[in-house]
Amino acid sequence: MSLPLPSFLSSNNYNSSETSLLTEGPESDEEDEGPLLKQYRLKNMLGYGACSTVYLAVDVSTNIEYAIKEFKKTSLRRREKFRLMQLEKELGSFNDMDSSTIEDQIRNQEKKDPYYYIRKELDVLKVLDHENVVKLYQVINSDYKDSLCMVLNYCPGGKLASVDHGISFDPMPLETCRKSFRQLVLAVNYIHGKGVIHRDIKPDNILFKENNNLCVIDFGLAEFLPKDGFVKPASGTPAFMAPELFDNELKKIKGKPLDIWSMGVTLYVIAFAEFPFNGSTILDMINVIKGKSLMIPAYCNSDLRKLLERCLEKNPEKRITIEELLRDPFLTERGKHHLTSSSIVTAFSSIWEI
């Protein structure tokens, strides 16, 4: 199983030579104003990844701010070509002559469905509507820029934590960890209830909204669960990937426990400002995830310790379920609180207003 270099150990695969909406969008009708995309005025870049760039934008008719995620079709075509070539190689039917055939196949699919490259992500986002999950408002096919753009809700509070380039923050207070993880559990419980798994839960994919609610973002690796609940192994961010994903003998694995493991790593990272399983190289880190026992600092709260041990159980059959998380002693404070959206919002806001 081949794994890409995780983003927190390498630079992003961003090609700055490709034009962006901000640098070369339709001309502004006013000086010192950003370019327009439909009714959205682009203000500044918020971030970027391998195939996308995210901008802050404002709807000129309502003055409401949004995040616009732009996908360059040239990058998407390269990614899709690589995926199809890998698939052909696995089937043993690829040869050098197939490259142009694959390109034609991709172009034909694009003509049939302009949103072909991000169809899976769009289909997932369309079924999700929850206060702790990113909301999709509009999709724009920009022929002018050869781009596909998602208009999403803007989260001005920033990330839960940034670990893509290493950890450089202090451990979060116990109550902050509790309130944060409560909302993450509510979000994932909803997502799983819709028959979806996220597959890339990590602090960088969890943002704060204006009201201090958490918002799970980036469903680029998400997928709908088959009826049997099993999925094929796939790449993600290695530090947050469950050990069963590194077992080459497994052709299919249970989907929901993958998200639970990633949630456990996320909780550990914000609680202790370090990874539960780490290594100097990717291979070293994978071996640690697969074989090393979980080590938790001695000062850890006893209920938090038990929760982490259950989330980071290497056997997915024994790993805590999302239903059990809703009743967990650490999150409910031993039954004092029920995990419901309304109760969590009030409690969480008070913590962050101290």
UniProtKB/Swiss-Prot annotation:
Coiled-coil region: none
GO molecular function: ATP binding; protein serine kinase activity; protein serine/threonine kinase activity
CDD domains cross-referenced by the UniProt entry: STKc_LKB1_CaMKK
Compartment annotation: Cytoplasm; Nucleus
Chain positions recorded as ATP binding sites: L46, G47, Y48, G49, A50, C51, S52, T53, V54, K69
Keyword match Membrane: no
Major subcellular site: cytoplasm
EC number(s) from the headed UniProt entry: 2.7.11.1
SMART domains reported for this sequence: S_TKc
Protein kinase domain location: 40-331
Listed name of the protein: Serine/threonine-protein kinase ppk34
